[in-house]
């Protein structure tokens, strides 16, 4: 899947991730089922203060680009915090991260968990595919069809691991 940043979607987080503006996809919401992530605890998931926690998926651990994305994201984060000289940051950003376009913000609306051991995607989705039409079949879970709930539905982090109870996918709508 392409690199992405995840936040809970609180206004303070949306404001801050807009300043970070890297990587190119910002996903707001959970869809997570196995325990709480650090960003879901107080003080981060709390409207009464300005503290923000973000989670970044930079890529596969073994992929050479993953380290580059991680460093570029950290540099953009420091730039947004205004704690490091901008020249220091610009001198260290990779060429593709120096002038990123406006990151796309998406809301996580659904989390799909396999009910059976017979869950299969209709295509070998890798993540960030946008399915144009509502009602498009994207998977089969036993005898149940899994359909997109709205037009322009983004598929976030499809999981091809087998097993009932496994989170298979998050569905997202443009913010």
Predicted feature residues:
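Structured catalytic-domain cores with a bias toward divalent-metal coordination
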Residues: 1-175
